[in-house]
Amino acid sequence: MAKNKIRVRYAPSPTGHLHIGNARTALFNYLFARHNKGTFVLRIEDTDTKRNIADGEKSQMDNLEWLGIDWDEGPDKPGKYGPYRQSERKDIYKPLIQELLDKDLAYESFMTEEELQAQREEQKARGEAPRYVYEYEGMSKEEIKKAQDEARAKGLKPVVRIRVPHNKTYEWDDIVKGKISFLSDTIGGDFVIQKRDGMPTYNFAVVVDDHLMEITHVLRGDDHVANTPKQLVVYEAFGWKAPEFGHMSLIINTETGKKLSKRDETVLQFIEQYRELGYLPDAMFNFITLLGWSPVGESEIFNKQEFIKMFDAKRLSKSPAAFDGKKLEWINNQYVKAAKEDEIMDSSLRQLIKAGKVQADPDAYTIEWARKLISLYKQQMSYTGQIVEMADVFFNEPPVLSEDAKKELADESAAIVLKEFAERVKDLPIFDAVEIQNTIRSIQKDTKIKGRKLYMPIRIATTREMHGPELAPSIELLGREKALKHLKQTLEEMN
């Protein structure tokens, strides 16, 4: 490997779909690699077979690609450091576990889960932090071997634990948080590096993989801080150099003020959910990049290449990042407004079809009608899924008039405007936005009613709303029959 060549990785477990927090981890590693002309590795940590879900790996990869995050090495892009799934690396871990056993840096432990639980309960009752207490304390090598043989004869399967040195400080200069240190006696005692089924634990496999894949920097979430001293124990046991670590701040839900938790249903947290609602990938990329990292200056809208160019890990924040759904909507709206018509058309039409508002295989007339409808709302949409609710009046029976709307129609001029409008549009030879606008102007000219008193009654009567997109095109899309029906209904309600 070239000297100082940066290699980073994103190493998800296929136990669920791509979470916002995990997407941020992937994104920051990607930006760090691209900014420094390094290598970005995708590695699947699938040793927790009980929690893996069928499409977990596919979901991770599909959604990373959707966000615009591409990797240089991974399960689908093999390199010289593979395999890139931990489940395919068992033959790599086994001899290394054995090496530690042979050097007496690790040992087999036969304590059952029940015994370990009882030990923890006793410690808790004494007000002590739970920790593993060495089960062979005071025993000779011969006595230990005898105890292990007897346990094996009973059919018990061992775990392998690594020896944690006593009263030793493990510290590192964290890229985000600065100096962090742990006393070895506070990390829970000798910890498991191989489970009873022969699979390595996370804190062992991750060290082996990072070392053999020559990972130089590990950027990950704040929840991994407590894992780092354990991993440093493993690095030390093998005499390997550890990479640089950086632990990114927590993400806080602005609605609750609490840490973003997968159990928190007050906010959508998975990339799939935002895709389904019609958020744009570039907008999500932009928003997520600002969760715990800030550019120089006041601007917040940047494209991917701009983020790559200016990304500096020193600007990763120590303070919690605020997940603000309103800000995400604002950012996405900026991207919707700037996007090409075809992109928004395709995404919005899918939303209308999914909601059953438009047939699954629309004909040319329906597509053209939908194109005009979507264009009408493009500037207002925070995400394309909003088209379904925003354009509800075009698909469903008109809603009951609000009290504010009724007040607007209380002026006697409203009835004059609506009767004139209904009479004139009924016989329009061409029912389109131009002719509708000309009709409104002619009413103004003939009645001398203008401004809000002219336009608001027509908007309320036809669209049943007080606010919305441009009026004449909206009425054109409603169609003559529906517009006249709404006008008649409104006039009846006014009487």
Swiss-Prot record:
Catalytic activity: tRNA(Glu) + L-glutamate + ATP = L-glutamyl-tRNA(Glu) + AMP + diphosphate
Cellular-component GO terms for this entry: cytosol
Motif 'KMSKS' region in this chain: 259-263
Primary location: cytoplasm
Residues where ATP binds: K262
Compartment annotation: Cytoplasm
Biological processes per GO annotation: glutamyl-tRNA aminoacylation
Subunit-structure text: Monomer.
Family that this chain belongs to: Belongs to the class-I aminoacyl-tRNA synthetase family. Glutamate--tRNA ligase type 1 subfamily.
Name of the protein described by the UniProt record: Glutamate--tRNA ligase
Source lineage: Bacteria, Bacillati, Bacillota, Bacilli, Lactobacillales
